[in-house]
């Protein structure tokens, strides 16, 4: 009788554990496709998509009325002070990101990055980055090719 109760309790516990939504931990939480829907970097209309893989990224950005441009490179995610993670990286042309970002908060669906007085908020893209964005993006070979924003910012790159 006691053994039967233990088996029922064990079976119920297994069902409960397998039915819960898995909460990803860093760095796995970062992996995937993201869209930047809010930035304090510029007043210009921007559209930024980024894919984070295990140690590399691909970034698609459109500033103002311009075309999408695609950048790629590598990144690192390291534990920082106060339990925050620090996100930094380098473009494929060897240029480091404009700043290191503190990951202020992150869930499976939202991520807030900050560097100094710049804050960017990303939401996870379900279904991947739109194909029209990928297909229309011009590859950028160097920082000099990064383009010019409508507000005059030269070589503006997100991240």
Each model region followed by its residue ranges:
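Sec-dependent signal peptide recognition
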Residues: 4-10
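Conserved beta-hairpin
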Residues: 47-57
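Edge beta-strand at a domain terminus
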Residues: 71-80, 114-159
